[in-house]
């Protein structure tokens, strides 16, 4: 009789553990492959920006630029300073100069390829195991 009670208690404990495991969320989010992954990235990264752009398109611009005429001389002098600075010159250099003088993109891994590798790594792991919204938002 004691063995039956022990067996019944172990089955009840095992059942409770199974129910608890089913109620727990998965360690990763949703499995997203291919287009679904790209759509999730676009929705996560671009959604709020698109909504902001839509809101700004419907607002009258007069509110934002009411005192714009008073600041034109100040802005012109700031623009002249910016054009003369070394930062502006760095931004206007050709890609070959920026990437070390190599003439082809294939020869220079640079930042572009590094971010592409991160995207490919997250894409494959998200497809295979699943990923959360916070992992997807790390690409923004």
UniProtKB/Swiss-Prot annotation:
This protein's record includes keyword Hydrolase: no
InterPro entries per the UniProt record, alphabetical: Insulin-like, Insulin-like_neuro_ligands, Insulin-like_sf, Insulin_CS, Insulin_family
Expression by tissue: Highly abundant expression is detected in neurons within the ventomedial dorsal tegmental nucleus and the laterally central gray alpha of the pons. Also detected at much lower levels within the hippocampus.
Annotated keywords: Cleavage on pair of basic residues, Disulfide bond, Hormone, Secreted, Signal
First and last residue of the signal peptide: 1-23
Annotated GO CC locations: extracellular region
Pfam family, one: Insulin
Cysteine pairs bridged by disulfides in the record: 33-127, 45-140, 126-131
Keyword field contains Transcription: no
Major localization listed first in the record, in broad terms: secreted
Localization annotation: Secreted
Subunit field text: Heterodimer of a B chain and an A chain linked by two disulfide bonds.
Functional note: May play a role in neuropeptide signaling processes. Ligand for LGR7, relaxin-3 receptor-1 and relaxin-3 receptor-2.
Family note: Belongs to the insulin family.
Protein name as catalogued: Relaxin-3
Species: Rattus norvegicus
Gene name per UniProt: Rln3
């Amino acid at each position: 009789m004691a063995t039956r009670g022990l067996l019944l208690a172990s089955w009840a404990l095992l059942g409770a553990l199974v129910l608890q495991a089913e109620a727990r969320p998965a360690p990763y989010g949703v499995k997203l492959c291919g287009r679904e992954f790209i759509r999730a990235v676009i929705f996560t990264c671009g959604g709020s920006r698109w909504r902001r752009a839509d809101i700004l398109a419907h607002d009258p611009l007069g509110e934002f630029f009411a005192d714009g005429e008073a600041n034109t001389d100040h802005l012109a002098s700031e623009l002249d300073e910016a054009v003369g600075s070394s930062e502006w010159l760095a931004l206007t250099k050709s890609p070959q100069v920026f990437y070390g003088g190599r003439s082809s993109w294939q020869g220079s891994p640079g930042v572009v390829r590094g971010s592409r590798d991160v995207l490919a790594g997250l894409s494959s792991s998200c497809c295979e195991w699943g990923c959360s919204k916070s992992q997807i938002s790390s690409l923004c």
